[in-house]
A protein has these predicted regions:
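Bacterial N-terminal signal peptides that target proteins for export
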Residues: 1-8
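Electrostatic cytochrome c docking/interface patches
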Residues: 22-43, 81
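Hydrophobic h-region of N-terminal signal peptides that target proteins for export
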Residues: 13-21
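Sequence/structural segment immediately N-terminal to covalent heme-attachment motifs in c-type
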Residues: 34-57, 89
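C-terminal capping alpha-helices of c-type cytochrome domains
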Residues: 91-92, 103-142
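Sec-exported extracytoplasmic/periplasmic mature domains
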Residues: 45, 49, 78, 94-98, ...
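Stable alpha-helical elements in mature extracytoplasmic
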Residues: 36, 44, 85-88, 125-128, ...
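Gly/Gly-Pro-rich "capping" loops immediately C-terminal to redox-active cysteine motifs
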Residues: 41, 57-90, 109-121
Length: 142
């Protein structure tokens, strides 16, 4: 059972604490903005670009404050034999797959946040994850 309020609070606390650890960089707390589940691009810009950059290459404004550099999301297909790892990306977004590179879970687990945002509408959560994954797939280098 997901506990969205507790997880959401933990994610916000994590974001705030990142600023404290990065002495030169201050991360301002921003509440999660509700976006359209139909737009993978809108979700990426609002939820992912702060760390991964608008181009998905890992150079977002909060990247320097992280212990481990954010992944370059434009080479996921390249690293997977030329095929975009749709299932793996979905698992990461839902929180089903752990990321060793993220160490202490610096990357928010979006599944529970999407669940809270959609007020428990499983179809909307799945739509968000599918459309965000499709947008990340569109960023892949050729």
């Amino acid at each position: 059972m997901w506990r969205p309020k507790r997880l959401f609070s933990a994610v916000l606390l994590l974001i705030c604490s990142l600023g404290a650890r990065a002495q030169e960089k201050v991360i301002q707390h921003e509440p999660v903005k509700r976006t359209s589940p139909a737009s993978g691009q809108e979700m990426f810009v609002n939820y992912c670009a702060v760390c991964h950059g608008k181009d998905g290459k890992g150079g977002g404004p909060a990247a320097d404050a992280l212990k481990v550099a954010p992944a370059n999301l434009t080479v996921l297909s390249q690293k997977n034999g030329g095929k975009f790892p749709t299932n793996h990306v979905g698992s990461i977004l839902r929180g089903d797959a752990s990321l060793a590179a993220h160490g202490s879970q610096e990357m928010p687990v979006w599944g529970p946040i999407f669940w809270k945002m959609s007020q428990g509408n499983a179809g909307e959560v799945q739509q968000r994850i599918a459309n965000l994954s499709k947008y990340i797939e569109s960023l892949q280098v050729k």
